């Protein structure tokens, strides 16, 4: 399962669809361009030789399905804080399972999950180039090349 994601460190969100407690997330691999460019910054500063990360015809496209979803959220990666607790990398740093996370604690504390769900509840995160997707579920995700 993890081999599809571990081969690249840059992934971009293409599509997210939620229906009937199934969350489908389609992502595309970002590839570092062979062509570099100079980037101008504020106050007359610049960085030379920057290579953009792009989705190309060579990019892999992957679908990750989370069944039995109880809650999910999408956060702009610029505003996301690191998770407390332990983290198990499933697909490199891209797909992770969290234990004792602040998000899992928040969802359980502010919902009826503890009262209504008998199965163990898990917190997964997808750490993409521009988005962090947190998922609370009672089942393992599946990953497939599309």
List where the protein language model places each region.
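Surface-exposed, interaction-prone regions used to assemble/regulate multi-protein complexes
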Residues: 1-146
């Amino acid at each position: 399962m993890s081999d599809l994601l571990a081969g690249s460190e840059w992934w971009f969100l293409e599509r997210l669809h939620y229906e009937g407690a199934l969350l489908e997330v389609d992502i595309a691999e970002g590839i570092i361009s062979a062509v570099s460019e100079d980037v101008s910054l504020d106050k007359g500063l610049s960085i030379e030789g920057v290579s953009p990360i792009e989705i190309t015809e060579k990019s892999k496209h992957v679908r990750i399905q989370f069944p039995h979803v109880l809650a999910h959220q999408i956060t702009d990666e610029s505003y996301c804080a690191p998770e407390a607790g332990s983290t198990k990398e499933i697909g490199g740093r891209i797909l992770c399972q969290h234990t004792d996370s602040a998000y899992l604690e928040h969802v359980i504390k502010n919902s009826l999950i503890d009262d209504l769900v008998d199965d163990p509840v898990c917190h997964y995160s997808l750490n993409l180039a521009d988005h962090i997707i947190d998922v609370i579920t009672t089942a393992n995700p599946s990953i497939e090349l599309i």
